[in-house]
Amino acid sequence: MTTSTPHKTRSTRDIFNTRFVFLMAAIGSAVGLGNIWRFPYVAYENGGGAFLIPYMVALLTAGIPILWFDLAIGHRFRGSAPLAFRRISSRWEGIGWFKVGVNFFIAIYYAAIIAWAALYTIKSVTQAWGDDPAEYFMGDFLQAEPEATYSGHIVPSILGVMILVWIVCIATLATSINEGIGKLTSIFLPVLAVMFIILVIRAFFLDGAAEGLNAFFTPDWSVLSNPSVWIAAYGQIFFSLSIGFGIMITYASYLKPRTNLTNTGLVTAFALSLIHI
């Protein structure tokens, strides 16, 4: 599937220098909590290794087709989600803004999680959490009340890092697609891959690692008749591939005018699925 773009937008839209840079940006936008944190426990709760069957079905029947759809819209109409949908029909522009709204709320809690991770990276040098990580996280780190479900208390150290995170994000978005997102993802995604490999190797030597691996890779085939397992698989696909959020629409708008979207979508989808497993 190769698409061409409207003539009037070809000279006014920046483009990724290479397909590799686009792939790094696309994969980097999807690799996160949905891959590293959410997928393992969803698989564990839904039959372990057997969950891979509904997951692969969901990938082939929903994930890849919707990813192609996002890529095609962004590439054909050369704009962010609201602009792309408006160019299709003014009545559809609201769909694009809905996607922007979803991403706005995601960015709010992701900034907090990134701040936590950055601070924990520093504190890991001395293992500041000691023998009781849970108590340290809720008490010393978040400074939250034991029974509180919500607190308006501001933790200066976390706030400072969050402000820094937002400054970096805004500065990145203010630069060109290649000098900003393209360059950063091309550098930090390989770094993430190395860190992830180290984390996995470290996890193999933790107490209970063998039991966890056995639980994950021992399939419970009986769950395949449970509709909730299939619903969980299809839900996971949206987290895993970052589809339906308008992100891939925007990224695809920066692809070269003549691009093989079929191959690009397949590489992106299967690369992300490999990371999960």
Predicted regions and their residues:
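Hydrophobic core segments of alpha-helical transmembrane domains in multi-pass membrane transport
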Residues: 58-62, 102-108, 114-122, 161-174, ...
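Membrane-interface "cap" regions at the ends of multi-pass membrane proteins
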Residues: 1-37, 66-71, 75-87, 94-98, ...
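Helix-loop-helix hairpins and the membrane-proximal interhelical loops
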Residues: 2-6, 11, 185-241
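Inter-helical loop and helix-membrane interface segments of multi-pass membrane transporters/permeases
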Residues: 10-13, 42-46, 81-98, 113-174, ...
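Transmembrane helix-boundary motif of multi-pass solute transporters/channels
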Residues: 18-58, 211, 247-255, 264-266, ...
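Helix-loop junctions at the membrane interface of multi-pass solute transporters
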Residues: 13, 40-43, 170-176, 232, ...
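Conserved small/polar residues in nucleotide/adenosyl-binding loops
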Residues: 276-277
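Extracellular loop-to-transmembrane helix junctions
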Residues: 43-69, 95, 157
